[in-house]
Amino acid sequence: DFESGCTLQERRAEKECQEDIVKERFFQIFDKEKIQKVCEAADAQYVQINKKIGMFVRKSTKQNRHCGNGYFYIGMYFRVLLSMLLDSDWTDTEKFFQNEELKQRISKKEIQKIWQQSIQCFENYLNHEIRNKAENGQSLQAVRQEISERCYEEAEKETRLYRLTVPTGAGKTLSSLRFALYRAERTQKQHIIYVAPFNSILSQNADEIRRAVDDPDIVLEHHCNVILSEKKQEKDYKKLTETWDVPIIMTSAVQVLNVLFSGQKRDIRRMHTLCNSVIIFDEVQAIPKKCMELFNLAVNFLTNFAESDVVLCSATQPSIKDLKENNLSECMEMTEIIEKYEEAF
């Protein structure tokens, strides 16, 4: 301003907020009564959430499990809300600047159809590509079949948190995926998320899972070693990694831990994707010990408050039962004890 000598930033800092005008214009666009009802409903929901968290913490303490502090779970709820706010705001802003229509995401009806088709393809893959292979051997195949059937049966139950402890070579990837597909279809889950600690495991299993569901477009492989040849592919891939808006997500433990705990907005944005999902943690024993207590609490939140089902897979489960605090909530074994299968492998 040449007259006053003030910069634009200084003028903005000095300018009083015309609150009355802001309110008047805001309610010209939005219905005041409707907003008030939404706020009242949100307040009532918050009260119910607090009660639910309190009951969970008291119950776990009474059972001498000590599954964490209620403030942690409240913080997770706030993180999910912030995630939805960031995702909706960034998506809307991107479409506005690109002058594109804001598309609807995959509907419940569409995702159910995807799960049904994937199950059909998966069972065909098991029958023709796996069970009929001569090199598998009858005794080994019988054990793998038993493990797979147990996982299939558990998909019909109501348990939210499982351990799948079977020897290396017992087919835990396909068995856990079988559980995930049937559970996702039965309970109308939005995503299946497969998590592994090493990119080599991810790349290997991603190829097999794509073949198993017979539709590479519904599988996102998200880790630093993914290389794409075309610029359009890179652009589309980048968008998907920002939102995880795809039915089956295969990613690293680092990515998931960032989504759960990082302060970066790009990580927080994906937090809501972990809700209403089936999540498979492969080789869970590789998660660093210093992260284990926070990991336990995050799994508790996902399975007790976020409508997700979690499977912890390993040939040797980490010793996490004897922690003084921050334990996992009740966890069911998906199969028989590991000693039963070790002789076969």
Task: Indicate residue ranges for each PLM-predicted region.
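N-terminal accessory nucleic-acid engagement/regulatory domains that precede
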Residues: 1-133
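Walker A/P-loop
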Residues: 158-181
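Pre-Walker A (Motif I) flank of P-loop NTPase domains
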Residues: 157-163, 190-191, 245-246
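SF2 helicase catalytic motif II
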Residues: 253-257, 265-305, 310
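Inter-Walker segment of RecA-like/P-loop motor cores
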Residues: 214-261
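Interdomain hinge/linker at the junction between the two RecA-like core domains of SF2 helicases
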Residues: 229, 316-345
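Conserved Walker A/P-loop ATP-binding site and its immediately adjacent core
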Residues: 180-181, 188-213, 226, 319-321
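Conserved pre-motif I regulatory segment
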Residues: 127-165
